[in-house]
Regions:
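DNA major-groove recognition helix of helix-turn-helix/homeodomain DNA-binding modules
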Residues: 118-134
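A short, exposed loop/beta-hairpin motif centered on an aromatic-Gly-Thr core
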Residues: 23-34
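Beta-strand residues in well-ordered beta-sheet regions across diverse protein folds
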Residues: 18-20, 28, 134
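Short, charged recognition helix plus adjacent turn
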Residues: 134-148
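Acidic/histidine-enriched, beta-strand-rich ligand/metal-binding domains
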Residues: 11, 17, 35, 48-49
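N-terminal segment of the canonical double-stranded RNA-binding domain
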Residues: 1-14, 18
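Short, charged, surface-exposed hinge/linker loops at domain edges
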Residues: 1-3, 40-103, 107-113
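A short, compositionally biased micro-patch
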Residues: 10, 20-22, 126
Length: 148
């Protein structure tokens, strides 16, 4: 899952970062590299806010010069969350289906928590979905979310 980001020099000599697909994800950095890394945090914060508000997290569609590549687990969590919303499945119902405690469900949906892929596979399976991972060649101007 990779989101396009827009970076422009701000009036106070910082770099302003916006995310077209997540308008509430706005950040800045003192340097271009710092701005790129801050974009990861801004995107994850926007995702968590949408979950808190029970809103769908939009799939990345915009194109741009720079991109933020999120961890595969984050993509799985977004897919799980959006599926839960679509199916009207709450956290408690997911916990019952998986025989999990509520903190396990909370961690499975927390984009900043390092969930195991096996737990995400299990959670997606009870919603009727499966997880597929592809390996892609690296391209210039990608920002690795792990570095943040």
């Amino acid at each position: 899952m990779r989101y396009a980001i827009r970076i422009r020099k701000d009036t106070n000599d910082t770099f302003l970062v916006t995310v077209p697909d997540l308008p509430d994800a706005i950040t800045f950095g003192e340097t271009l590299d710092e701005a790129k890394l801050q974009a990861v945090d801004a995107i994850e914060t926007a995702m968590m806010a949408r979950m808190s508000d029970r809103e769908k997290i939009p799939e990345p569609k915009a194109s741009g010069r720079y991109y933020v590549e999120l961890r595969p687990a984050v993509a799985a969590k977004v897919a799980l969350w959006n599926t839960m919303l679509q199916q009207g499945l709450g956290k408690a119902a997911l916990a019952r289906k998986l025989n999990w405690h509520m903190p396990q469900v909370d961690r499975a949906l927390d984009v900043r928590h390092e969930s195991t892929l096996s737990s995400l596979v299990d959670a997606l399976a009870v919603t009727g979905n499966s997880l597929s991972i592809s390996v892609l060649a690296n391209k210039k101007r990608r920002i690795n979310a792990k570095a943040a």
